[in-house]
């Protein structure tokens, strides 16, 4: 399996598949926000940023999968997936165990050099409450679904990093 993951990390297909899944999740989030009129909270916005990190890592990996740039993509992927797990876990705990003393911020705090909420307010402005349960599917809230998704991204990222020393088998069709 590790050889297979190593082989996949050297090709564009797996990176583009990861980019497609992250983009599909981002578009789904925008659909929930603008069509279903659900209000994203600050943690939702941060989770969205972590997902953009996974998307960016996938695009970097797809650009040059056979060069050392692939390792940069893996580091960004690991960091974004890890932060996504942290954020969605915190968000899940806020929803499962609401407390007046444990709340999220009123607005997202982006660095001064990257004010995403000012540049693209349709995507990055938070207007909801983190503890409010707005949507449920199969008994799970949205942060719980995202927690599973980010855990999957993180597990695959760790396996891909571990697989890097394992070289792919050369398959010779006629056994020479």
From Swiss-Prot:
It is a multi-pass membrane protein. Residues 32-49, 90-144 are periplasmic. The chain crosses the membrane at residues 15-31, 50-65, 72-89, 145-163. Pfam families: DsbB. Its main location: membrane. It is found in: Cell inner membrane. One of its GO terms (biological process) is protein folding. One of its GO terms (cellular component) is plasma membrane. InterPro entries: DiS_bond_form_DsbB/BdbC, Disulphide_bond_form_DsbB, DsbB, DsbB-like_sf. Disulfide bonds join 41-44, 104-130. GO terms for molecular function: electron transfer activity; protein-disulfide reductase activity. Keywords: Cell inner membrane, Cell membrane, Chaperone, Disulfide bond, Electron transport, Membrane, Oxidoreductase, Redox-active center, Transmembrane, Transmembrane helix, Transport. Residues 1-14, 66-71, 164-176 are cytoplasmic. HAMAP family: DsbB. Required for disulfide bond formation in some periplasmic proteins. Acts by oxidizing the DsbA protein. Belongs to the DsbB family. This is Disulfide bond formation protein B. It comes from Escherichia coli O6:K15:H31 (strain 536 / UPEC).
